[in-house]
From Swiss-Prot:
Predominant place of localization: secreted
Protein name per its UniProtKB record: Beta-2-microglobulin
PANTHER family according to UniProt: BETA-2-MICROGLOBULIN, MHC CLASS II-RELATED
Domain of life the protein comes from: Eukaryota
InterPro entries on file: Ig-like_dom (IPR007110), Ig-like_dom_sf (IPR036179), Ig-like_fold (IPR013783), Ig/MHC_CS (IPR003006), Ig_C1-set (IPR003597), MHC/Immunoglobulin (IPR050160)
Location within or outside the cell: Secreted
Residues annotated as domain Ig-like C1-type: 23-114
SUPFAM superfamilies on file: Immunoglobulin (SSF48726)
Pfam family, one: C1-set
Signal sequence coordinates: 1-18
Amino acid sequence: MGLLICSLLLGLLCCSMAKDTPPKVEVYTREPEEFGKPNSFICHVSGFYPPQINITLLKDGKEIPNTQQTDLAFEANWYYYLTKHVSFTPKEDDEFICRVTHMGKSKDHFLMIGL
């Protein structure tokens, strides 16, 4: 019983030591980008705290349906990471954005294709 209480207190202490930190965002594709070829649009968000976060994948300003998201996970330092992705076939002039909202602030991260 004492070990359980110590473990719980240690977990609470570690959580209280983590400070508010904005996410690092990486936007990329599974394969090299090529217009007209199926691929995966991936947005990986890491190193953030607190864990409340929203990731939205957009094409030409509209939310892309059928996206998939990993389970929220954390590292030993109590900072979190998460990945959202979707299959897509890019066409010239398409605009793809990963919009990340954390602590009430939204920021758009663009997927650059053909550059």
